[in-house]
């Protein structure tokens, strides 16, 4: 497990916050709410309690699931329960054995919500399926269908 902590947001989070602020100034709405609405309209997103869950149509890597929330994750038992169900679903029903998960906590001073991102690292027995140069420097290589992944996640959340 890797854990990174800091007093200031890391570069990608700071960039996302800046983009989100400019988006609100230009369009008068939340970038993250609008992205979620597009995913929901495509059948890839669901609101569950105070969180929005969706399977990305532009995943960084296989089976990318994004959870946006505006609560204190350490005290939100519903969010914790949903995260548990999603992880169990990915492991038990989607065959995910190696994954990365990042969590940016909600900070009311920032434009962005709390964000949890989960990606499948691929078959642990295959060196070619893990993250590599193509994903980092070129384009993402995606072989999974987000509709199949999200239908399983939705079923787990509804259980």
Where are these regions (language model features)?
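HIT superfamily nucleotide-processing domains
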Residues: 1-159
């Amino acid at each position: 497990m890797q854990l990174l902590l800091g007093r200031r947001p890391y570069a990608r989070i700071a960039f996302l916050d800046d983009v989100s602020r400019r988006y609100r100034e230009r369009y008068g709405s939340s970038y993250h709410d609008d992205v979620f609405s597009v995913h929901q309209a495509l059948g890839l997103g669901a609101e569950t309690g105070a969180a929005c869950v969706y399977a990305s149509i532009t995943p960084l890597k296989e089976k990318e699931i994004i959870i946006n929330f505006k609560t204190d994750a350490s005290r939100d038992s519903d969010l914790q329960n949903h995260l548990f169900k999603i992880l169990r679903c990915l492991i038990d029903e989607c065959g995910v054995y190696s994954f990365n998960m990042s969590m940016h906590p909600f900070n009311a001073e920032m434009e962005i919500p709390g964000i949890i991102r989960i990606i499948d690292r691929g078959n642990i027995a295959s060196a070619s399926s893990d993250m590599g140069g193509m994903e980092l420097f070129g384009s993402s290589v995606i072989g999974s269908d987000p509709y199949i992944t999200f239908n399983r996640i939705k079923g787990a959340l509804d259980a």
